[in-house]
């Protein structure tokens, strides 16, 4: 089972919109996760130390996490994971395949 967490041990129930970009050489890339009204925000917990992508292989971590505010209230979270090598890309794709499978998601190539 693959899960995304903002606080270790607490799974985020809102499924994000994920946008991927990849360099022409295929070694580097970027994944932008956008969570609209995530549980973490609904519960009023903004003690975010990072985004943790957890599966049976272990954990992928990004610290580049930002809250979006409207009228002084947090309404969304955007997290960016930068992929710096081909092995990191392969590991990320394995995680995303597991996450998609466990949450009934699909992949659309643009």
From Swiss-Prot:
InterPro entries: Psb28_c1_sf, PSII_Psb28_class-1
Keyword set includes Membrane: yes
GO CC field: photosystem II oxygen evolving complex; plasma membrane-derived thylakoid membrane
Pfam families reported for this sequence: Psb28
Domain of life per record: Bacteria
Keywords in alphabetical order: Membrane, Photosynthesis, Photosystem II, Thylakoid
Protein localization: Cellular thylakoid membrane
Gene Ontology BP term (one): photosynthesis
Topology term for the membrane: Peripheral membrane protein
Subunit structure of this chain's protein: Part of the photosystem II complex.
NCBIfam families: PS_II_psb28
PANTHER family assigned: PHOTOSYSTEM II REACTION CENTER PSB28 PROTEIN, CHLOROPLASTIC (PTHR34963:SF2), PTHR34963
Family of this protein: Belongs to the Psb28 family.
Protein name: Photosystem II reaction center Psb28 protein
Organism this protein belongs to: Cyanothece sp. (strain PCC 7425 / ATCC 29141)
């Amino acid at each position: 089972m693959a899960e995304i967490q903002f606080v270790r041990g607490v799974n985020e129930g809102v499924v994000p919109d994920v946008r991927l970009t990849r360099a022409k050489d295929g070694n580097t890339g970027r994944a932008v996760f956008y969570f609209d009204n995530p549980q973490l925000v609904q519960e009023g917990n903004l003690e975010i130390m990072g985004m943790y992508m957890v599966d049976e292989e272990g954990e992928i971590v990004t610290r580049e996490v930002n809250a979006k505010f409207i009228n002084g209230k947090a309404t969304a979270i955007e997290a960016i994971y930068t992929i710096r090598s081909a092995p990191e890309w392969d590991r990320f794709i394995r995680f995303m395949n597991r996450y998609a499978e466990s949450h009934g998601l699909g992949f659309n190539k643009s």
